[in-house]
A protein has these predicted regions:
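N-terminal small/glycine-rich loop or linker at the start of catalytic domains
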Residues: 1-31, 95, 137-143, 192-224, ...
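N-terminal beta1-alpha1-beta2 module of alpha/beta enzyme domains
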Residues: 1-92, 216-219, 365-367
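Hydrophobic faces of well-ordered beta-strands that scaffold small-molecule active sites
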Residues: 5-11, 55-57, 96-102, 125-131, ...
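Conserved, mostly hydrophobic/aromatic
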Residues: 7, 47, 51, 89, ...
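Flexible, glycine-rich active-site loops centered on histidine and acidic residues
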Residues: 10-35, 105-195, 240, 249-250, ...
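Short, acidic/polar
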Residues: 32-47, 112, 223-236, 288-304
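C-terminal helical cap(s) of enzyme catalytic domains, especially alpha/beta-barrels
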Residues: 141-147, 151, 162-168, 251-259, ...
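Long hydrophobic segments that form regular secondary structure
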Residues: 199-202, 209-263
Length: 367
């Protein structure tokens, strides 16, 4: 029997086309603002109706996608905080995984740790995190604390340290540290909170966290990777990697590079921008595919045969392309018995992705 395909969706603004805002307003003049909780809740409800593994929420330190300092008046400008958006939609969803982007370059790992741990608690074990680096001088100037790194490799060295700190902080409370025993007047077992005592080139963090250990123990860490150094970062720091093949040849090459980097344990999702009859003349780091839902299914299953675990679809225009994914593409996969027909109640995101239980590195072995 052929294995089921894993499928997620990547959300950014009104969609991944640079003029998605215009297409959205043309199709739905009364559509909500991207700063509205109702807008994001609606997208999440649609994605969950399609039984998708997870949704990711993009974020950067610039008001528009890309590395330019100047702001184009013709493109959507401004963005909310992805982690806060995920926390907003967690209570109105029940099953779908929530993976926001959070930039590590100018953000303390302590803050990221407690934010993602909180998201995992409020979503009952459905949280993940996609670290991102920031490399431009104008992004560094927003914070006024230091210059941008000249060496991109150093950015990922720092990012690896940041992820390690975050992971240690998630483990700094044992699972049963909270007692809540009114009779003995003990709320917490202090012996089950641990200093992490991390000392590295970029961070020195004592810990423990101020947030109890997340329900998953270790929320899922994902990385978007385009190059060998980032495949190495994913292999050492992540559970899940998003790759960007443009054809079968590049897919085979990337999968080989991920393995060479030590990423045999990673769940590999290929990114694909999809538009169903829309414009394809726009820039993207990932392949842009225009076709019918059946055409997309053929491509996805072909990629699965070549070795990916799943695909993360990026709708060119959320308002028009996401419903086609959910209402037309997913049923085709279901009829082919290649996609789930229901969620499992109480399933965490780690469980859905087939990741192992995350042991606590600080828990002593007790008789």
């Amino acid at each position: 029997m052929n294995p089921a395909l894993h499928l997620g969706v990547a959300l950014d603004g009104y969609g991944w086309h640079r003029q998605a805002w215009r297409a959205t307003l043309a199709a739905q003049p009364a559509t909500e603002s991207v700063f509205s909780g109702r807008y994001w809740s609606g997208l999440a409800a649609t994605a969950e109706r399609g039984l998708l593994d997870f949704l990711t929420i993009d974020d950067t330190l610039t008001p528009q996608p890309g590395r330019r300092e100047s702001i184009s008046p013709r493109r959507l400008a401004g963005r909310g905080d992805a982690v806060l958006v995920a926390a907003r939609i967690a209570p109105v969803t029940k099953h779908i995984g929530l993976i926001p982007v959070a930039t590590v370059t100018h953000t303390e790992p302590f803050h990221i740790s407690k934010a993602i741990a909180t998201l995992d608690h409020v979503s009952h074990g459905r949280a993940g995190w996609q670290p991102r680096v920031s490399s431009t001088p104008h992004e560094a100037a927003l914070f006024g604390r230091r210059d941008a790194f000249a060496d991109g490799g150093e950015l990922f060295d720092e990012a690896a340290d940041a992820v390690e700190v975050v992971r240690r902080l998630w483990d700094s409370w044992e699972d049963d540290a909270i007692i809540r025993d009114a009779q003995t007047a003990r709320y917490i077992d202090r012996a089950k909170l641990h200093y992490i005592d991390f000392h590295g080139k970029y961070f020195s963090v004592k810990g423990p966290s101020i947030t109890p250990r997340p329900p998953q123990g270790q929320p899922v860490v994902a990385a978007l990777a385009h190059a060998p150094r980032i495949y190495e970062f994913a292999a050492t720091s992540a559970d899940l990697v998003f790759i960007t093949p443009i054809d079968d040849v590049s897919l085979d090459s990337i999968l080989d590079q991920v393995k060479v980097a030590g990423g045999q344990h990673l769940k590999v999702y290929a990114d694909l921008v999809v538009t169903f009859g829309g414009d394809t003349e726009f820039g993207s780091d990932a392949l842009i595919f225009d076709g019918t839902p059946a055409d997309v299914v053929d491509l996805l299953l072909g990629w699965q045969q070549r070795g990916v675990d799943g695909v993360r679809l990026r709708p060119a225009v959320n308002a028009t392309d996401l419903p086609v994914i959910v209402d037309e593409l997913v049923p085709l996969l279901q009829r082919a018995k290649r996609f789930r027909t229901s969620y499992r109640d109480g399933e965490t995101l780690r469980q859905r992705l087939g990741l192992p239980v995350a042991p606590n590195r600080y828990t002593e072995v007790r008789p």
